[in-house]
From Swiss-Prot:
<feature type="binding site">
    <location>
        <position position="206"/>
    </location>
    <ligand>
        <name>S-adenosyl-L-methionine</name>
    </ligand>
</feature>
<feature type="binding site">
    <location>
        <position position="184"/>
    </location>
    <ligand>
        <name>S-adenosyl-L-methionine</name>
    </ligand>
</feature>
<dbReference type="GO" id="GO:0005762">
    <property type="term" value="C:mitochondrial large ribosomal subunit"/>
</dbReference>
<keyword id="KW-0809">Transit peptide</keyword>
<keyword id="KW-0949">S-adenosyl-L-methionine</keyword>
<dbReference type="GO" id="GO:0042256">
    <property type="term" value="P:cytosolic ribosome assembly"/>
</dbReference>
<comment type="similarity">
    <text>Belongs to the class I-like SAM-binding methyltransferase superfamily. RsmB/NOP family.</text>
</comment>
<dbReference type="InterPro" id="IPR029063">
    <property type="entry name" value="SAM-dependent_MTases_sf"/>
</dbReference>
<dbReference type="GO" id="GO:0000957">
    <property type="term" value="P:mitochondrial RNA catabolic process"/>
</dbReference>
<dbReference type="GO" id="GO:0005739">
    <property type="term" value="C:mitochondrion"/>
</dbReference>
<feature type="binding site">
    <location>
        <position position="252"/>
    </location>
    <ligand>
        <name>S-adenosyl-L-methionine</name>
    </ligand>
</feature>
<dbReference type="GO" id="GO:0070181">
    <property type="term" value="F:small ribosomal subunit rRNA binding"/>
</dbReference>
<keyword id="KW-0699">rRNA-binding</keyword>
<feature type="binding site">
    <location>
        <position position="183"/>
    </location>
    <ligand>
        <name>S-adenosyl-L-methionine</name>
    </ligand>
</feature>
<keyword id="KW-0597">Phosphoprotein</keyword>
<dbReference type="InterPro" id="IPR049560">
    <property type="entry name" value="MeTrfase_RsmB-F_NOP2_cat"/>
</dbReference>
<keyword id="KW-0694">RNA-binding</keyword>
Length: 381
């Protein structure tokens, strides 16, 4: 009985490779020093699931799946190019200018017997084309036009709302406090209202991207004249540098960039090494908004914006900055009502109905723009 068993054991031993392993390769893999157990994007989703499920309740599953799905874009027409022919080409794609559609709708309401919408005090001359609800078509990449400038700029169409809300008027002096990568700066220039525009960002690499956008879309005489100034200063100190200077200020602050954080590992604020930076974001945001308000002339307006869903970075920051200016500078600031934006742009965006102050575009599979929070503030004389 023992002999057959021994023969089987010998056969098995012949099949097994007992080649010795060099000592330097014999180690136990340690995840902490090799690949992270959780990627930054996974940590972001984990964080959002914990916080936003409480903040948004039953809406969170819908927002979540939309954030994880492909984003929609709008095409901001370059008014410095042959904008009329560009608009015609975009219309041939069955896209519509959502800004002009909203304004036309507002003008028709009194004739239809509906209650009139408050006057849309928005920045003029902006043309941004989007595909209709549920249409997931994509715009072709922008091309160099006949005038040597790019035809249109692809962006999250919700990013145009803070610029519209700023309500620029001809001859305004304007500050874009956190300007890079440049989409909103370009939109500000498209209005044709800026007598002077200061575009600032602390990061020199990001202002380099901003300069490239301006070079591709804006004529040389405007770029190199006195109309546009690009700087890389600490935005928190702007109230000291140029206090009481600007008619309108856009404060599009650094934030958790929720959609980006779920899709990109590079430069993700949910990296473990950036935990302290992430925790300090609300304080930085309050400081930047306060600086923007101090840089505004008495009677001027500021729009605060983020691409985050977090009320800690949105409503709470607005309230914190208002209290800071009242207590430390004896400056009164009033939040302006933008609820009519929800009515005017409801065909293009999905708005969260329960913001304490300001407006919030939430991602929705039918209209997958955002997130984008924006709030308009009036520095009282």
């Amino acid at each position: 009985m023992a002999a057959p068993v021994l023969r089987c054991v010998r056969k098995l031993l012949k099949l097994v490779d007992f080649t010795p392993v060099p000592r330097r390769y014999r180690y136990k893999k340690k995840w902490a020093t090799t690949e992270p157990q959780f990627t930054a994007s996974r940590l972001a989703l984990q964080n959002f699931d914990m916080t936003y499920s409480v903040q948004f309740g039953d809406l969170w599953p819908s927002i979540r799946v939309s954030l994880l799905s492909e984003q929609k874009y709008g095409a901001l027409v370059n008014n410095f190019a042959a904008w009329d022919s560009v608009s015609a080409k975009l219309e041939q794609l069955s896209a519509k200018d959502f800004v002009s559609e909203a304004i036309s709708h507002q003008k028709l309401e009194p004739e239809s017997g509906l209650s009139p919408t408050p006057s849309l005090d928005c920045s003029p001359n902006l043309r941004c084309f989007t595909f209709s609800r549920g249409d997931v078509s994509r715009f072709p990449p922008a091309r160099l036009g006949s005038l040597g400038l790019m035809d249109y700029y692809l962006m999250d169409a919700a990013s145009l709302l803070p610029v519209l809300a700023l309500g620029l008027q001809h001859g305004d002096t304007v500050l874009d406090l956190c300007a890079a990568p440049g989409g909103k700066t370009l939109a500000l220039l498209q209005t044709g209202c800026c007598r002077n525009l200061a575009a600032n960002d602390l990061s020199t690499s990001r202002t380099g991207r901003l300069q490239k956008v301006l070079h591709s879309y804006v004529p040389q005489d405007i770029r190199e004249g006195n109309q546009v100034r690009v700087t890389s200063w600490d935005g928190r100190k702007w109230g000291e540098l140029e206090g009481d200077t600007y008619d309108r200020v856009l404060v599009d602050v650094p934030c958790t960039t929720d959609r980006h954080s779920l899709h990109e590992e590079e430069n993700n604020i949910f990296q473990r090494s950036r935990k302290k930076e992430r925790q300090m974001l609300p304080m930085l945001q309050v400081q930047l908004l306060a600086a923007g308000l101090l840089a505004t002339k008495p009677g001027g307006h500021v729009v605060y914006s983020t691409c985050s869903l977090s009320h800690l970075q949105n409503e709470y920051v607005v309230q914190g900055a208002i209290e800071l200016l009242a207590n430390q500078y004896n400056i009164k600031v009033q939040v302006e009502d933008l609820s009519h934006f929800r009515k005017l742009f409801m065909d293009t965006f999905c708005f969260f109905p329960s913001c304490q102050v300001g407006e919030l575009v939430i991602p929705n599979l039918m209209v997958n723009f955002g997130p984008m929070y924006f709030c308009k503030l009036h520095r009282l004389p």
